[in-house]
Amino acid sequence: MKLKLIFSLFLVLVFCSLFVFGDENETEGQESRIDCRLVRCMAANCTEGQVPYKKKGECCESCMLDCSLVDCYTPKCKKGYYLKKPEGQCCQICQRECSAIQCGIPKCAPGYISQVPVGECCPTCVKKPVNPCALVLCPIVDCMIGWVPYKPEGECCTKCKQDCTTVKCAMPVCEDGATPTKNPNECCYKCPPVNCAAVQCLVPKCNANESLYTPPERCCPICRPNPTLDCTNTLCPIVDCMIGWVPYKPEGECCDRCKQDCTLVKCAMPVCEDGSKPIKNPNECCYKCPAVDCSTVRCMRPLCNENEHLYTPPGKCCPICRPNPNCTDAICPACVGHIEPGQCCPTCDTIPVGPDCTTVKCAMPVCEDGAKPTKNPNECCYKCPPVNCAAVQCPVPKCNANESLYTPPERCCPICRPNPDCTGIMCPECVGTKLPGQCCPTCDSIPVEMA
């Protein structure tokens, strides 16, 4: 009776152990198996010399070296080693015979795992690989209709891309017989970029209401209708051009600007290199030589003295020697940089941190003499460059009885502006001059009360 009871208990223990460990192994097996029918694979974008290849246990193809292009050398293995071709490689290597070796299981410290190195039989402790995405907090991606989530290679967070199953693409016909290509995260093929430097274009003649336009990824221009300009809600500043300059409205803009009055300018016709014809821009008065294509010019490098440096003049391709500047009285900015040949001050690599311009709203100023507004590196807003007012002849406007002359800052010529309302303003008791447009005098001296 006792023997039957002991035997029954033994059977129960064996059954329980088989049930527990069998269920655990089955769970692990279920977790390790992936149903490739539920996986959507991108086409392997292999380069020249590579072929698509599917690794064991994976659903999608990756790229590996085309073994038909590889000439392998068969090594001679020493005793205890045998020839084996690793998965994903083309050539055989010598691998140790591990069937006759008994290995112990190492006890690894925290942060280390047991792993068998390549070419070895027994496991050793190696540092556990760090997952760079473990500490990255990714946003929840809610893709719109027609887009699907995907994780780009080498990135931690999921992004949205177009669902190519809902997109119908037309195969483009590329110029010069080029083959269309497709990026991994795009649905449609497109033409590769063309080297436009080697393309000779025929310039079409456009109508009066058309203009030349070069489409993206194309080399040659086409004619397209001019866009209609709507200036209904545009508020333009009053343009007051100085003597020798006239107002004009640039094509495609709503507001007037100032340009030089070409009837007062005498120009000399330049003689250009290589027999090229001088050209004139629409808003300029004088002709100038077109830019030279220096890509086909070979230059002889001149040997300069110690007090000279190489310099390439504007519009020229080849450098010449010119004297170094006198840097005795030069005032240079405080920055870290390198000094170019022929310069006194360094080209700043690092500039001190300026103001936070994200909180500043600036209006673009309209400068006199047609000058372009400039912006200093440590400032947020554009401003007009300083004008030499000594060389400017200003017409003095006639102001009304309730107006006075006023010269705005950074301007040379005065304008009329309304006089201020001085009722109720208490002025200090002093000796001074009352300027036009002011309520109180500018005090030269203040009387002192005697005790």
UniProtKB/Swiss-Prot annotation:
| Gene Ontology CC terms, in alphabetical order | extracellular region
Carbohydrate-modified residues: N25, N45, N209, N326, N402
UniProt keyword Glycoprotein, yes or no: yes
Location in or out of the cell: Secreted
Q: Domain of life, per the record?
A: Eukaryota
Q: Which residues form the signal peptide?
A: 1-22
Keyword Protein transport (UniProt)? no
Q: Which UniProt keywords apply?
A: Glycoprotein, Secreted, Signal
The protein here is known as: Uncharacterized protein DDB_G0274171
Organism listed in the record: Dictyostelium discoideum (Social amoeba)
